[in-house]
Amino acid sequence: MTISKKSMKWIPWILILPVILIRGFTTLYPILVTLKNSLFDIKVLSGVNEFVGLANYVNVFKDDKVQTSISFTVIFVVVSMVFHVILGVALALILNMKFKGRRFLRTIVLIPWAMPAVVIGMAAKWGFNNDYGLVNDFIRRFVEDFQYNWLINTGSARAAVIAMDLWKDLPFFAILVLSGLQFISGDIYEAAKVDGANGVQSFFRITLPLIMKNVVTLCIPFTLWRLTTFDLVYAMTSGGPGEDTSLIAYRITTEAFTNLNVGYAATLAVMAQAQLRAALNNAHRPNTGVDALFHVGDGISHLHHISN
């Protein structure tokens, strides 16, 4: 039996149909249900399920807890990513140097990244304890009567969460930057050295411009991962003190599974998803997002050339 050319055109679609159906069921269907739920007041415990239209969206802007979560999420993402870039590039440069034990160091440096965030959060909760934590125990070796509750005070609790997030994911960021450094030919540095360039000049004129695309591209997924951080906060501070370390992902989970306020949680999820989508679209927009930032390295190199 022969198959006509017209029938052959449908074979690829038939083959990918199961994937499309599975993808639609696991992605599209939950999104549509979440959109629908965001228009309802759904409280599981009281059995309430009433259509309220956009009331949930209006209430978001009046909710002090949500505003606190949004403000800390912004602080968390910005501060964490700034240090990811600065310290990540610095660590990558160190790992790119030639020294004995380099391969071993490149391996063990990934141990924090390989550990579950919940384990890190629980260890940090113990480590920052005032009475028996490692942090205060170390400080008391120099200041005998030192007493400080790191996770009870807002500023230090937020700083501790950011520090542990860096401790976990910074090595992975550095290894990915290192992969970009590996593609830079050593002949370029040799030529620069012959021309009289020192280490600082080589970094700004050669290294930084050549790894800029790699670094900026890495910032996209790492920023998205910061925006969806939940497990670290859950294990380390449970959003405390008060709501001061409650990231938006933690707030959504709390509303859905602790308060059982499904409609309000769906509203927060829709708004968070919209912000993520807008950020992604802006990041890939020509001349405004990542494409524009790709020229930053060239600009830095040019400015450094002028200054010298």
Question: Model-flagged regions — what are they?
Answer:
Residues A283-T288, A292, S301, S307:
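Short linear motifs in low-complexity or flexible loops
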Residues I3-N282, N308:
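A structural signal for multi-pass alpha-helical bundles of membrane permease subunits
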